[in-house]
């Protein structure tokens, strides 16, 4: 039979191999003709490289968080794909991973420097920061760039950073300038070592310095090396630039909508001016007083983050259960007598009753905040009401709307609260004169204390349990499913909890008063 003919059999085998190769070649040809954006959409995943630090990305009590992480979530949502975060502990691995195609985007709070824009596309800037030289408080302070060449201490910077690049330029003016470049580290670590006195000086971005001072108050500013510089995401320079074009569109949209301003407010709008004495006192209180009351804060926080209730209590009484003011408010939460009665507190000096009552009163204030305000912002409006009164807070919202601002965002309303002291504004309001500036300081202090507790916990614990650690080809990833269009909860807040709760993790070893 023909089927047993060796020549026919051989021909069939060759034909089958040729057909398979042709099909594979066709698939490859088709893949090569896809744009970068089409390839990402076809794969169903956008891979975002970032740095594991307090601003860009970290794993908190409620899962992944950070400014760059939240921006990446929104970008993945725009694409309709899963988000795969690839956080690294040092800068050295980010751009090489981008170049070899291991990630699609670098999103790590990095400066647009000359060498970076020569090799990569920079998306539109999403915030600005200057370069700051820092030293330990109480030690010798360099006051101008020339002082760094006096050999009165060692200047240490992250290898390959924009800070190192700036020093290379400065060396042309100051030939005696020297420094050490450290590869396996990041700015957060260098700032910590300066605070401990293990390093003399380092350079960090102004935003990182401000955040670090909340948990390392001995970090002191020596001088500003540069003016504000743009911070951006980066992508490879490809032939079609489709991904780059979409990033330009994306950042334009979130700037126009106000989403970017709200995220910036969330992550560093609370920083404000730095008070060395207050910060030192607060950190001492975290160590000496907070452990005694932590269980009660957790017990009565319910839907709140217990650290927020703790921050509120510190603002009110400095965690002193016997605190009494000349106006008659008293206890851990400094409740007035009418407020205490309204929440069932019989003894305001009983710390458990006071904490329970304070949390319940805040809950009541939040329930009165209009549902048009997103849930994560309601608490700031409620705290302002807690301090200055609900009517005055609503006056500030109405004034914000009248001046063309967004009365539903804390970013805009907090700018109008101090105006309630001025006659030309309060005489047109429903509730008249108010010490709105004090209410603003009250809320911002609580936000700072809250973030400091979080930062303190980060600095003194590990983000990951050993059971969660899995090494896959030396690469860590956090993969999230496609983020659905953000829908309003019944209280008007936006709900992305499903995306976070179903996160799949793998880890890399990279080298009140009134």
UniProtKB/Swiss-Prot annotation:
Residues 31-271 are annotated as: Non-LT domain. It catalyses: Exolytic cleavage of the (1->4)-beta-glycosidic linkage between N-acetylmuramic acid (MurNAc) and N-acetylglucosamine (GlcNAc) residues in peptidoglycan, from either the reducing or the non-reducing ends of the peptidoglycan chains, with concomitant formation of a 1,6-anhydrobond in the MurNAc residue. Residues 272-514 are annotated as: LT domain. Its main location: membrane. PROSITE patterns: TRANSGLYCOSYLASE. GO terms for cellular component: cell outer membrane. In the N-terminal section; belongs to the bacterial solute-binding protein 3 family. Residues 1-30 form the signal peptide. One of its GO terms (biological process) is peptidoglycan catabolic process. It comes from Photobacterium profundum (strain SS9). Residues 482-514 are annotated as: Disordered. This is Membrane-bound lytic murein transglycosylase F. PANTHER family: MEMBRANE-BOUND LYTIC MUREIN TRANSGLYCOSYLASE F. GO terms for molecular function: peptidoglycan lytic transglycosylase activity. It is found in: Cell outer membrane. It holds the Pfam family SLT. The gene is mltF. Murein-degrading enzyme that degrades murein glycan strands and insoluble, high-molecular weight murein sacculi, with the concomitant formation of a 1,6-anhydromuramoyl product. Lytic transglycosylases (LTs) play an integral role in the metabolism of the peptidoglycan (PG) sacculus. Their lytic action creates space within the PG sacculus to allow for its expansion as well as for the insertion of various structures such as secretion systems and flagella. Its EC number is 4.2.2.n1. It is a peripheral membrane protein. The active site is at residue 316.
């Amino acid at each position: 039979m023909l089927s047993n003919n060796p020549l026919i059999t051989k021909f069939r085998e060759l034909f089958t191999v040729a057909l398979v190769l042709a099909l594979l070649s066709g698939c490859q040809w088709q893949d090569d003709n896809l744009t970068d954006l089409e390839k990402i959409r076809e794969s169903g995943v956008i891979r975002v490289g970032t740095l594991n630090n307090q601003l860009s990305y970290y794993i908190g009590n409620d899962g992944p968080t950070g400014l760059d992480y939240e921006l990446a979530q929104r970008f993945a949502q725009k694409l309709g794909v899963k988000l795969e975060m690839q956080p690294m502990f040092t800068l050295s691995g980010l751009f090489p991973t981008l170049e070899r195609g291991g990630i699609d985007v670098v999103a790590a709070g990095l400066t647009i420097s000359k060498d970076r824009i020569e090799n990569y596309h920079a998306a539109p800037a999403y915030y600005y920061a200057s370069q700051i030289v820092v030293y330990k408080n109480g030690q010798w302070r360099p006051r101008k760039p020339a002082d760094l060449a006096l050999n009165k201490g060692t200047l240490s910077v992250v290898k390959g950073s924009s800070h190192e690049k700036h020093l290379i330029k400065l060396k042309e003016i100051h030939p005696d300038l020297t420094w050490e470049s450290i590869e396996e580290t990041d700015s957060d670590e260098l700032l910590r070592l300066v605070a401990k006195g293990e390093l003399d000086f380092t350079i960090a971005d102004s935003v990182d310095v401000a955040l670090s001072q909340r948990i390392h108050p001995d970090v002191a500013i020596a001088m500003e090396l540069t003016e504000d510089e743009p911070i951006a995401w980066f992508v490879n320079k490809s032939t079609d630039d489709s991904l780059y074009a979409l990033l330009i569109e994306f950042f334009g949209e979130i700037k126009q909508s106000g989403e970017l301003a709200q995220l910036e407010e969330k992550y560093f709008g609370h920083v404000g001016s730095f008070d060395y004495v207050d910060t030192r006192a607060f950190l001492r209180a975290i160590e000496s007083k907070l452990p005694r009351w932590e269980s009660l804060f957790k017990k009565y926080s319910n839907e709140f983050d217990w650290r927020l209730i703790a921050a509120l209590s510190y603002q009110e009484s400095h965690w002193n259960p016997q605190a009494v003011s000349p106006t008659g408010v008293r206890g851990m939460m400094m409740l007035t007598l009418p407020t205490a009665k309204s929440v069932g507190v019989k003894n305001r000096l009983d710390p458990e009753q006071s904490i329970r009552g304070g949390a319940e009163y805040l809950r009541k204030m939040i329930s009165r905040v209009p549902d048009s305000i997103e849930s994560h912002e309601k608490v700031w409006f409620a705290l302002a009401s807690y301090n200055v009164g609900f009517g005055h807070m609503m006056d500030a919202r109405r004034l914000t709307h009248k001046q063309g601002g967004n009365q539903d965002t804390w970013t805009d309303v907090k700018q109008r609260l101090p105006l309630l002291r001025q006659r030309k504004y309060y005489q047109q309001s429903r509730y008249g004169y108010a010490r709105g500036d004090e209410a603003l300081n009250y809320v911002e202090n609580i936000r700072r204390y809250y973030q400091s507790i979080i930062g303190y916990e980060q600095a003194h614990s590990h983000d990951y349990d050993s059971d969660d650690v899995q090494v896959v080809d030396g690469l860590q990833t956090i993969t999230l499913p496609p983020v659905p269009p953000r829908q309003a909860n019944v209280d008007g807040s936006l709900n992305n909890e499903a995306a976070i709760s179903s996160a799949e993790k793998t880890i890399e070893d990279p080298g009140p008063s009134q």
